[in-house]
Amino acid sequence: MTIELKNEYLTVQFKTLGGQLTSIKDKDGLEYLWQADPEYWNGQAPILFPICGSLRNDWAIYRPQERPFFTGLIRRHGFVRKEEFTLEEVNENSVTFSIKPNAEMLDNYLYQFELRVVYTLNGKSIRTEFQVTNLETEKTMPYFIGAHPAFNCPLVEGEKYEDYSLEFSEVESCSIPKSFPETGLLDLQDRTPFLENQKSLDLDYSLFSHDAITLDRLKSRSVTLRSRKSGKGLRVDFDDFPNLILWSTTNKSPFIALEPWSGLSTSLEEGNILEDKPQVTKVLPLDTSKKSYDITILN
């Protein structure tokens, strides 16, 4: 099912499959969101839950509770992105989706939960709020959540990928960890200098010749994608998320994904117990955790 919100600036669409954003068009009909061309990547803006990235061998290990050191299978980016969400509510400027675990999810992730995703259209901005409720009455629930929106790049006919830059809200000097595409794991100790006293990064396909770029040490909580020719662009604000992942495929795809994550793929030096992973969010019984980010069209 497709749902549409519209105001004087934007027309935005969503679908119940994955509970995800599927289109952002301005008043002139220009599409900003990647439209899932399978030649490159058939995704658009999947929701990553209850993990971001990959676990070692896809296994989540849990501390002794009712079962001693139970192990569950959770593949890269979690399981909700391929599931049908329930449409809870639609009004003039917002839509709410929700999902609860089925039997297969509970076999591998040992917590009763409800994930609600609230999209709000306000002027030229779309806010996505993730509301994660722990429905357990006695157990604290560990989770990670992330957004994976991909944007057309170039946005305008006649432009090319290299005409675009990323602009950070702060001057940045940071390194990035080594990644292993075949497993999805990271080596947080083996790092390569990436940004050196700069607020902008010119895009080039060579940036993604190996894998995604994991920015886990950014000061900025905002990044702008902008054409140096037409000025067209958008901004992603991610105050609630400590990490930003930049990604495109290795075959020169006409898109870039700007991904706020609450956690990272498993690193070589960390263990496998989900509750002990760095940056894990823990929700008390019957409590709710909320995280949000914003996409703003700039023209």
Curated annotation (Swiss-Prot):
CDD domains: Aldose_epim_lacX. The keyword Lyase does not apply. Keywords: Plasmid. GO terms for molecular function: carbohydrate binding; isomerase activity. It holds the Pfam family Aldose_epim. GO terms for biological process: carbohydrate metabolic process. Induction: By lactose. The operon consists of lacABCDFEGX. Transmembrane segments: none annotated. The keyword Disulfide bond does not apply. This gene was sequenced from pMG820, a laboratory-derived deletion of the naturally occurring plasmid pLP712. This is Protein LacX, plasmid. It comes from Lactococcus lactis subsp. lactis. The gene is lacX.
